[in-house]
Amino acid sequence: LNQKLKKDREKLKQSVEESENAIDELLIMSKYIEEEFYSINPSILHDIQKYHAEAWEILEKHKWTFVLNGIEKNIFRGIKEGIYHNDFDPTIIAKLYVGKCDLIMGGEIFEYPEHKLDRVFKDAISFHIRGLVNSKGLNYLQKRLKNA
């Protein structure tokens, strides 16, 4: 588990380095996470939580430190670059993002196999990005998605 999380951290740090701006960074990170979700059956997460408390604690710590900090930094970056709205608290939005991931992975609302995690995450991140970007960012996002 620690090796997997280390690999994830390295991949997400790489996305920051390779990205042109905060939108690209979030798109690269999201694509990676979406691909990871594609292979996860939510019952596995439930089993980890129920039967492997130590592993679950590691996952929770990773989510509420590394992921939260990464999203918060992304929001500050987007505001600084002038492509995200600047009229909200980045910490609140980052916590909402992590909470949304919990909701997606929980399996109570988006039951598997009716709702595939990768599809739910893709829709959630699309909604998240569109809520972050201002008009300049939206223009960039639309061009970026059109050329993807």
Each language-model region and where it sits:
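Short, basic, alpha-helical segments at the C-terminal edge of helix-turn-helix-like DNA-binding modules
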Residues: 1-9
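A short secondary-structure junction motif
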Residues: 8, 36-41, 74, 78, ...
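All-alpha amphipathic helical-bundle segments outside canonical DNA-binding/catalytic cores
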Residues: 23-24, 62, 80-96, 114-119, ...
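C-terminal peripheral helix-coil segments that are non-catalytic and often amphipathic
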Residues: 73-77, 81, 114-148
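Hydrophobic alpha-helical connector segments
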Residues: 10-43, 94-97
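Amphipathic alpha-helical core segments of compact helical bundles
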Residues: 31-34, 53, 64, 98, ...
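Secondary-structure edge/capping motif, primarily at the C-terminal ends of alpha-helices
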Residues: 15, 44-48, 104, 108-111
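Short secondary-structure transition hinges
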Residues: 35-72, 80-92
